[in-house]
Amino acid sequence: ALVKAIAKACTHTRYAYENMLASLSQYTKRELCHLMGAGYAGFLEENCDLDIKCPVLILVGERDEMGKVKQYCSAWQENTGYPLHMIKGAAHNSNVDNYEQVNMEIEEFTEALPE
């Protein structure tokens, strides 16, 4: 039940859901809980002002309901001016839900970078 709940929470398309189920099915409930705890602890620890020395592109699924990801991404964009693009028809795993748009956004971003 935990694997299905996680897969449902972070995906929007059937393909992404099945992909997430396959990825998570290798873990026990205890391992999943440990990984989630470690991930959140690391996020809280790393959620600070950063001085990033390379170009940044922020991508977030328009249907991302994981925690406050959309809020954080919007605030990050407002505070830094980094470009933020919403991925249509995608949840937290936007690169699987809508890989075509994700790839297009990355390609356009990298092509526009100065040489």
Which residue stretches match the model-derived regions?
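Conserved alpha/beta-hydrolase catalytic His-Asp/Glu region
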Residues: 1-51
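Hydrophobic alpha-helical packing elements
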Residues: 32-35, 72, 102
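Conserved loop-alpha-helix segment in the C-terminal half of the alpha/beta-hydrolase fold
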Residues: 55-90, 96
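Post-His helix in hydrolase/transferase enzymes
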Residues: 96-110
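Alpha/beta-hydrolase-fold serine-hydrolase catalytic core, especially in secreted/extracellular enzymes
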Residues: 114-115
